[in-house]
Design a protein with these regions (language model features):
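Long C-terminal interaction/binding lobes of large macromolecular proteins
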Residues: 1-141
Length: 141
């Protein structure tokens, strides 16, 4: 007899790059453990892979972290982390003037938004004949 599958709460958000409405869930203990192991390793690639796997799992496979723009992955990760661990993060900001003084600050992850200008385009017109089309940076770039 198989173990029962526990339901997790689901939430919706608007994907910054496409405006698509997407469902996601908080991460589970096993996924949090993957993040902790990656963090302890200190390897950038392992951290990026763990973050990508977490986003893939928590969006029910709707977002492919290998092909989605980095800003989408970061935005999703912050939203998932907020619903999983808590929306408020305590930070110690270092003063830019002396580089030593720290100021405590509490950031609400729900307030973090991806800003896109109205005239934003990934195309740059060099002259009448030449136009360059860029792609957004990816997680493993």
């Amino acid at each position: 007899m198989a173990l029962p599958k526990l339901n997790t709460p689901t939430y919706e958000l608007e994907l910054p790059s496409t405006g698509e409405i997407l469902k996601y869930r908080p991460f589970l203990v096993k996924e949090q453990k993957l993040l902790l192991i990656a963090q302890e390793s200190g390897e950038e690639k392992q951290i990026a892979n763990a973050m990508g796997e977490l986003v893939n799992s928590c969006t029910f496979g709707k977002v492919n972290a290998k092909s989605a723009p980095m800003f989408d992955i970061e935005y999703l990760f912050l939203r998932i982390r907020g619903k999983s661990v808590g929306e408020k993060v305590k930070l110690n900001l270092i003063c830019q003037d002396d580089g030593k003084t720290t100021v405590p600050y509490e950031l609400n992850l729900e307030d973090v938004e991806c800003q896109v200008q109205d005239d934003h385009s990934n195309e740059i017109q060099i002259n009448e004949d030449i136009k360059i089309v860029f792609r957004y940076p990816l997680l493993n770039d």
